[in-house]
């Protein structure tokens, strides 16, 4: 959040008095700057709304509403929709794991494997990505690895039908907001293979810095490629 927007946000918050944890608000921060929901971000001439609906409960992150998306907890009942993209080789291999083989396998992952990983790695629950106005999960975004107490790695998947629309970037901005505010992280990282150009573009759009390029690593299929790691510090995010 830029200093200009943050100052305006604080002014409105002070004037409004005590705030409920869940709500919808609208106010003028500065000329041409309109704040909606709990958070306002202005970027590249566009208004970007991020509305965080509540707070963290145990390990569950609050639902989030953005301009076009609704991010919510993934449920076992979402298995069929998630399988629709998690079963595609062009989606999963670049992300570092093999395609799901059945809806039943996906159900087991959602019900047993995923919650166990959250506990063992001390990472918060992630999100299913839904288009606003629908409840269909078309993608996933979460913190999939913990590298330090205050450093988490972000990962994401999206059904190919929705590629090229900026959906992952929009969802990732919301996850950054949660990570740096509610989770009080110092740094968020993104790791991808050198041939995954789409993931590299997302990291660059979000303001991440390429910090390392490890040569000739094996990918999930055993093929040699570069492994790239990007990082974004909280101080850099606050200064945007």
Pin down the residues of each PLM region.
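N-terminal, intrinsically disordered charge-dense segments
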Residues: 19-20
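Hydrophobic residues in alpha-helical segments
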Residues: 86, 95, 117-119
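Conserved GNAT-fold acetyl-CoA-binding loop/helix
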Residues: 90-114, 127
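Catalytic Tyr-X3-Lys helix of short-chain dehydrogenase/reductase
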Residues: 114-115, 180
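Short, well-ordered strand-loop elements centered on a beta-strand within folded domains, enriched
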Residues: 115-116, 154
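Short loop/turn motifs at secondary-structure junctions and domain boundaries
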Residues: 117-122, 208
């Amino acid at each position: 959040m830029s200093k200009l927007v943050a100052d305006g946000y604080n002014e409105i918050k002070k004037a409004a008095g005590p705030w409920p944890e869940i709500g919808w608000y609208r106010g003028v921060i500065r000329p041409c700057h309109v704040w909606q929901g709990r958070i306002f971000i202005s970027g590249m001439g566009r208004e970007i709304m991020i509305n965080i609906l509540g707070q963290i409960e145990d390990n569950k992150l609050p639902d989030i509403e953005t301009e076009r998306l609704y991010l919510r907890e993934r449920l076992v009942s979402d298995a069929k929709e998630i399988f629709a993209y998690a079963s595609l080789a062009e989606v999963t291999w670049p992300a570092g794991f093999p395609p799901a083989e059945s809806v039943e396998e996906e159900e087991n992952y959602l019900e047993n494997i995923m919650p166990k990983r959250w506990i063992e790695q001390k990472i918060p629950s992630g999100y299913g990505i839904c288009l606003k106005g629908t409840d269909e999960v078309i993608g996933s975004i979460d913190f999939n690895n913990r590298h330090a107490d205050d450093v988490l790695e972000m990962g994401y998947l999206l059904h190919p039908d929705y590629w090229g629309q900026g959906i992952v970037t929009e969802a990732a901005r919301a996850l950054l907001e949660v990570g740096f505010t509610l989770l009080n992280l110092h740094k968020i990282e993104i790791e991808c293979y050198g041939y995954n150009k789409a993931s590299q573009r997302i990291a660059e759009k979000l303001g991440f810095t390429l910090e390392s390029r490890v040569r000739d690593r094996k990918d999930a299929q055993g093929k040699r490629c570069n492994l790239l790691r990007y990082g974004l510090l909280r101080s850099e995010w606050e200064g945007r």
